[in-house]
Regions:
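Anionic coordination/interaction segments
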Residues: 1-244
C-alpha cells in the first residue's frame, strides 16, 4: 500500500470532485475495516457487520462525522468536508487517513486509525487557533449505528433498529450500543463510543440517541442541534431512529 497527498485548489472543490468514489481501505488482524472517501463519507465494519449506516445509493453524506462550531461567530464546519474552506488536504496512508483544513483561522488535523490487534478505531482531532483571541469551540460527533450485516439494514431499516439497545456509563463517560440476538445461535454485538479531550472542557459531556431530536425532521445537512447549540437530552430509551 502507498499513501498519497495533494492540496485541492478552490476551483477543484466541486461536488463532483469531492464525491469521487475513491475509498481508502484499512483492515486489521481482527477484521475491523474502515473505508472512507475524500470528504470523510464511508463505513466502519467488524467482520461482516456494519458499525455505522452507509449506502452508496443514498443522496446524502453518510459516515462518522465531527462538527466544530465557533461559539462567538456561529461558524460551523465538518472536520472532513471541504465546506469552502481556505485550504483542504487529504492523505490516505498505510497507517491512517488524515484530513487537514483551515477554516476561519482555525486549523484542524483529523486522523483516523485502526488498532493493529483489536477491533478499535481512533479518530483524533487536533485543533490549532491561529488568531490572537481566545476561542470557545463546540465539538460534536455523530453517526447512525447499525451493528448488523448490510442486507439486514437494507431490507427493513426501522425494524433493524428495534434490536439496538442504548446505554450510558456515567462513571467512565461513554455510550454503549448492544444489538440483541434475533435467533438463539447469534452473538450479541456491543459498541462503545467515547470522546475525551486533553484540553479544558466546559461543562459535562452531552449526548443524544434520537435522530429526529438531533438532526431535525427531513434534514440531511448540518444537524439542527449543532446549528442552534441546543443542549442534548442525555436521555436513554427506545428509539426507531437511533444515533450516537
Amino acid at each position: 500500500k502507498q499513501g498519497f497527498a495533494r492540496v485541492l485548489d478552490e476551483d477543484e472543490m466541486t461536488a463532483e470532485t469531492m464525491k469521487k468514489e475513491i475509498f481508502a481501505l484499512y483492515e486489521n488482524k481482527e477484521k475491523y475495516v474502515v473505508a472512507m472517501n475524500q470528504i470523510g463519507c464511508g463505513v466502519s465494519k467488524f467482520e461482516e457487520n456494519y458499525i455505522n449506516r452507509f449506502k452508496r445509493t443514498d443522496d446524502y453524506n453518510q459516515g462518522i462525522f465531527f462538527y466544530i462550531k465557533d461559539i462567538k461567530t456561529n461558524e460551523i464546519w465538518s472536520a472532513t468536508d471541504d465546506n469552502n474552506c481556505e485550504q483542504f488536504t487529504v492523505q490516505f496512508m498505510p497507517d491512517r487517513n488524515q484530513f487537514e483544513k483551515t477554516e476561519e483561522e482555525i486549523k484542524t488535523k483529523f486522523k483516523v486509525t485502526v488498532d493493529a490487534n483489536e477491533p478499535v478505531e481512533i479518530r483524533r482531532l487536533e485543533i490549532q487557533n491561529k488568531t490572537q483571541e481566545e476561542k470557545i469551540l463546540e465539538v460534536t460527533s455523530y453517526f447512525e449505528p447499525v451493528l448488523s450485516r448490510k442486507e439486514q439494514d437494507y431490507a427493513h431499516q426501522a425494524f433493524n433498529n428495534l434490536f439496538l439497545v442504548y446505554g450510558y456509563d456515567e462513571e467512565n463517560d461513554y455510550l454503549t450500543v448492544k444489538r440483541k440476538k434475533r435467533e438463539s445461535h447469534q452473538k450479541e454485538l456491543y459498541l462503545i463510543a467515547k470522546m475525551q479531550t486533553n484540553s479544558e472542557k466546559i461543562g459535562e459531556t452531552e449526548y443524544e440517541i434520537d435522530r429526529a431530536k438531533f438532526t431535525g425532521r427531513n434534514n440531511f445537512g448540518i444537524p439542527k442541534a449543532v446549528q442552534n447549540s441546543t443542549p442534548l437530552s442525555k436521555k436513554i430509551g427506545l428509539t426507531t431512529e437511533g444515533i450516537v
